[in-house]
A protein has these predicted regions:
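Conserved PLP-binding catalytic core of the aspartate aminotransferase-like
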Residues: 280-312
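PLP-dependent enzyme catalytic core of the Aspartate aminotransferase-like
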Residues: 311, 325-371
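N-terminal "arm"/small-domain region of PLP-dependent enzymes with the aminotransferase-like
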Residues: 1-47, 311-314, 334
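Conserved core segment of the aminotransferase class I/II
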Residues: 21, 196-261
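Conserved glycine-rich beta-strand-loop-beta hairpin in the small C-terminal domain of fold type I
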Residues: 244, 261-271, 282-295
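Hydrophobic residues in well-ordered beta-strands that form the structural core
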Residues: 89, 110, 168-170, 243, ...
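Conserved core of the PLP fold type I
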Residues: 35-165, 175-194, 263, 342, ...
């Protein structure tokens, strides 16, 4: 039986632009080898900073380029947080962001996510109880739910950020991967003075380029760059130089179109399979990104789910990892981008069988048995 991996949100290797990267590497080295292969400023490779600034309608002084958006988030935490500070996050949210925040000793306050993203009523209630230093959000096709924050919720975030004087950390790697519908304004476009926008070339080019970036107020960029310099002196100008040449050569827009053409139908296949094999369990209905998600119910034990899934030839991520505290239901993230249509459908069929089996066992009071 073929194993189907539903655990990681990775891109399809067939989308990696190997030939154009090879050509741009040669071109970039021929043009700027001395700078690409030398130490440089912690802010990142200047031509790539210039490209990102133009892309985001900003200034080069508002851009910091590093080894990845998660590392840059860690640097933001180093720069702005002290043990005991309060940080609001969506619940569920990106598991590695939770890990990073815990390593900094902060108090994490989770706010429930629904079909329209973060629940603004719950957010407002928590504001009356806690004063956050930062609010970490993934507004577009959130990891892990796939939810997209409504315009009203975005406006509320900006209004409260001004009123309560906290910074918004907008993690936006999926915003360019909308497969249907109209793009929504980013938090940064609504409040550039309050928003620290993180993104990455990981999902757009490949994880191997290890290049992410921060677009933020100039004073924030300088502060985070100072932290970055303490950690690695200088980022990889070699990788950043290749990406800069690749972007300047007009490769980014066609690559985005290619990703949408491949991943959009896979999302449709995933949603159809969930509706067929796991009816009523879809958490939200995403219009882009890398993930769908499921609400499996409280009676399904995590350990039993993982064991039964392994027997069925499935690899699943832990739903608990995406929560700051144990939820009252079983959650499962479903990545679809790296799987073809047949594996997506078969994976949902097997998962549906696993869930039905576990629910039947729970109702009868039996422990997990072999499927």
């Amino acid at each position: 039986m073929k194993t189907i991996d539903l655990s990681r949100g990775v891109p399809d290797p067939r989308t990696f632009p190997v030939d154009s990267l090879r050509a741009m590497a040669a071109s970039a080295l021929a043009r700027d080898a001395d700078r690409m292969l030398q130490y440089g400023p912690a802010f990142g490779y200047p031509p790539l900073r210039e490209f990102i600034a133009s892309w985001f309608d900003s200034a080069m002084s508002n851009v910091l380029v590093g080894h990845g958006s998660l590392e840059l988030f860690n640097f933001i935490c180093d720069a702005y947080l002290q043990p005991g500070d309060v940080v609001f996050v969506e619940r569920p949210t990106y598991d590695r962001a939770i890990t990073t925040l815990r390593q900094h000793g902060v108090k994490i306050v989770g706010i429930d996510v629904g079909a329209d993203g973060i629940c603004i009523d719950a957010f407002e209630r928590e504001l009356k109880r806690h004063q956050p230093k930062l609010v970490y959000l993934i507004p577009d096709f959130q990891n892990p739910t796939g939810a997209c924050m409504s315009v009203d919720a975005r406006r509320a975030m900006v209004r409260w950020a001004r009123e309560y004087r906290f910074l918004l950390v907008e993690d936006g790697p999926y915003g360019f991967l909308r497969y249907r519908g109209t793009p929504l304004p980013s938090l940064r476009s609504m409040a550039p003075d309050l928003t620290l926008h993180l993104s990455s070339f990981t999902k757009l080019i490949s994880p191997g380029v290890r290049t992410g970036f921060l677009v933020a107020p100039e004073d924030v960029v300088k502060r985070v760059a100072s932290v970055a310099e303490r950690h690695y002196i200088t980022p990889s100008f070699f990788a950043q130089g290749i990406i800069a040449a690749w972007c300047e050569d007009g490769r980014l827009a066609p690559q985005l179109d290619r990703l949408k053409q491949l991943y959009g139908p896979r999302l449709d296949t995933c949603l159809q399979a969930i509706e067929h094999y796991l009816p009523g369990r879809l958490f939200v209905r995403p219009d882009g990104g890398f993930f769908a998600s499921l609400r499996l119910g409280a009676r399904i034990d995590e350990q039993s789910l993982q064991a039964a899934a392994r027997e069925a030839g499935l690899v699943l991520s832990s739903g608990r990892a995406f929560f700051d505290a144990q939820p009252g239901y079983r959650f499962l993230r479903v990545p679809f981008c790296a799987l073809d249509a047949a594996d997506i459908t078969e994976g949902m069929r097997r998962l549906g069988d696993v869930v039905d089996h576990l629910n039947t066992a729970a109702r009868s009071g039996k422990a997990h048995a072999t499927i």
